[in-house]
Amino acid sequence: MPELVLADRDERDDLGAFVARAVRLDAQAVVRLRNREDGRLLDAWVATPFDTLATRTVAGRVEPSDVTVAGSELLTGLTVMRGERIDPGAPKDLMWRSALPPVEGWLPVDRLPVGVVSRLADEGVAVARENTGPHGTPPASLLDQTVLTVSGSGLDVKVPLRCLFALSGMGFLGSAEEEEVRVIATDAWLRIDARFGAVVRRRHSMLPLLV
């Protein structure tokens, strides 16, 4: 069975908040846990309903070093088990169906005020409520609309509304409007780093990849 060890209570609470948000957005969400090469940090990944990935890094380690578990079971383990070692639940690796971005090759593009990003997200939510589809969700055409274009390091990067929805829905932005989010990119990927986590998405549409 998988085993999760976190550095301290703060790291447990941080990961718990991340998983709770993911489960709130999608009760069937799975979380992929991956150790960093340094052995001291691990990355938690989740595929959001907005067709973006969300990630949070915490101090700790998991065995095996790359495992996918049910978000609801992981949340239970983080909430109930107060000892050093946590049972994150049974492995569900076959349920992870998203490609992960590369570790290296990222270039800095721009920094944006949190207040600006929050307002754009709020405006998008208001528009989405008026344009929900038959299943009660915004149409893909709305989510794919570019709300920001940023430039840097020789790259022009378009930020779609769905990325801002994911940042807001996962609670990554916080309430300090004077803070900034960082936009970085590769030729194929876009990443927006905020105070409490990051949202990642392919810059160009392509067929889904299985990993």
Q: Model-predicted segments: where are they?
A:
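Long, compositionally biased intrinsically disordered terminal regions
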Residues: 75-211
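N-terminal ordered "arm"
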Residues: 1-58
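A broadly used, surface-exposed interaction patch
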Residues: 52-87
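Short amphipathic beta-strand/extended segments with alternating polar/hydrophobic composition
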Residues: 45-46, 53-61, 199-208
